[in-house]
């Protein structure tokens, strides 16, 4: 299920816009994740107290974690599918330490898609959306495979 060169170009083009404001995008992605799927908060001890949108908006820790999430994802996307060295340590911590279910990776992928669509509607048309969706699916599938290697069924 690899992406074509053109699809990777679309993914990395829109990702450049995300990287221009990692803090803003990351913060919004996590807020969207926690608001749309409140059960995901249970996996984040330091964010469990954030129950309202205002609390989430004011959280510097949430903003910092958003930068971390999108920075790691960006490193993986830039490898254009050849991401074994970047993916393995991420999968290991998410499988063995954080125990993040694959379903939650789907949820954050949805949040990423929504935030990009809201912030960059003019640059995130159907082809770009399809390419990004495919890239995020590749990421999730490869994470799920690694989870199994680490004995986590997620």
UniProtKB/Swiss-Prot annotation:
Biological processes per GO annotation: removal of superoxide radicals
Catalytic activity: Fe(III)-heme b-[protein] + nitric oxide + H2O = Fe(II)-heme b-[protein] + nitrite + 2 H(+); H2O2 + AH2 = A + 2 H2O
A GO cellular component entry from the record: extracellular exosome
SUPFAM superfamilies: Globin-like (SSF46458)
Keywords: Cytoplasm, Heme, Iron, Metal-binding, Muscle protein, Oxidoreductase, Oxygen transport, Transport
Binding-site positions, heme b: 94
Annotated Globin domain residues: 2-148
GO-annotated molecular function: heme binding; metal ion binding; nitrite reductase activity; oxygen binding; oxygen carrier activity; peroxidase activity
Binding site for O2: 65
The keyword Ribonucleoprotein appears for this protein: no
Top-level division of the source organism's lineage: Eukaryota
Residue positions binding nitrite: 65
Pfam families: Globin (PF00042)
EC id: 1.7.-.-, 1.11.1.-
Keyword match RNA-binding: no
Places the protein is found: Cytoplasm, Sarcoplasm
Function: Monomeric heme protein which primary function is to store oxygen and facilitate its diffusion within muscle tissues. Reversibly binds oxygen through a pentacoordinated heme iron and enables its timely and efficient release as needed during periods of heightened demand. Depending on the oxidative conditions of tissues and cells, and in addition to its ability to bind oxygen, it also has a nitrite reductase activity whereby it regulates the production of bioactive nitric oxide.
Protein family membership: Belongs to the globin family.
Assembly and binders: Monomeric.
Entry protein name: Myoglobin
Provenance organism: Aethia pygmaea (Whiskered auklet)
Upper classification of the organism: Eukaryota, Metazoa, Chordata, Craniata, Vertebrata
This protein's encoding gene: MB
């Amino acid at each position: 299920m690899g992406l074509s060169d053109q699809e990777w170009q679309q993914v990395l083009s829109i990702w450049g816009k995300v990287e221009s404001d990692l803090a803003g995008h990351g913060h919004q992605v996590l807020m969207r994740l926690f608001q749309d799927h409140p059960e995901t908060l249970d996996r984040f001890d330091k964010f469990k107290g954030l129950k309202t949108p205002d609390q989430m908006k004011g959280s510097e820790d949430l903003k910092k974690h958003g930068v971390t999430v999108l920075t790691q994802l960006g490193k993986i996307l830039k490898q254009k599918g050849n991401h074994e060295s970047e993916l393995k340590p991420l999968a290991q911590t998410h499988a063995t330490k954080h125990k993040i279910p694959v379903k939650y990776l789907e949820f954050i992928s949805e949040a990423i898609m929504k935030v990009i669509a809201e912030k960059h509607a003019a640059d995130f048309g159907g082809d770009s959306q399809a390419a990004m969706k495919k890239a995020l699916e590749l990421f999730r599938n490869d994470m799920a495979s690694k989870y199994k290697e680490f004995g986590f069924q997620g």
